[in-house]
Amino acid sequence: MVKYSQEPDNITKSCKARGADLRVHFKNTRETAHAIRKLPLNKAKRYLEDVIAHKQAIPFTRFCRGVGRTAQAKNRHSNGQGRWPAKSAQFVLDLLKNAESNAEVKGLDVDALFISHIQVNQAAKQRRRTYRAHGRINPYMSNPCHIELILSEKEEPVKKEPETQLAAKSKKGASS
């Protein structure tokens, strides 16, 4: 069994999915995962489909040097830097669908699910080579990643009982 970096609070009301050594850029996937963190499942799926169709952008916050600005990213509460990493969005969307299937098998309410945990880790780099002038060879590396996510059902908070008026306390030393 594979170890997740975090276990869900309520195992019976959550489901998990993960992908290892995925051939998709780590940096783009990290930004994609950060954009959908804590979203409800149906909103996250719709958002990623819009990213693939270039209708909404993923705001880039950490790996953003040289990233151009777009109005679509400004709408997502960032400084305007954003892109449309379609391959990363597709990989994360596939994992969300996998986790949704796991939830259906477990008998969870799919409409009440939200992304309680999503994490992207760097995987071992894959090495290739490119041939340069004068007989030189340079590395041509890819940066794959591991993705893990946990979907949980929203728990309704316990409602506080309305306070009833209590009888006033009498003092111990007072005589009646």
From Swiss-Prot:
SUPFAM superfamilies, A to Z: Ribosomal protein L22
Choose one Gene Ontology CC annotation of this protein and give it: vacuole
**Protein name per the record:** Large ribosomal subunit protein uL22z
Q: Please give the biological process terms from Gene Ontology that the record holds.
A: translation
Task: Note down the stretches annotated as region Disordered.
Answer: 154-176
- What organism is listed for this UniProt entry? Arabidopsis thaliana
Q: Which gene holds the coding sequence for this protein?
A: RPL17A
Q: Which GO terms describe its molecular function?
A: mRNA binding; structural constituent of ribosome
> What family does the database annotate?
Belongs to the universal ribosomal protein uL22 family.
The Basic and acidic residues compositionally biased stretches are: 154-163
CDD domains per UniProt = Ribosomal_L22
Q: Which InterPro entries match?
A: Ribosomal_uL22, Ribosomal_uL22_CS, Ribosomal_uL22_euk/arc, Ribosomal_uL22_sf
UniProt keyword annotation of Plastid present: no
Q: Which UniProt keywords apply?
A: Ribonucleoprotein, Ribosomal protein
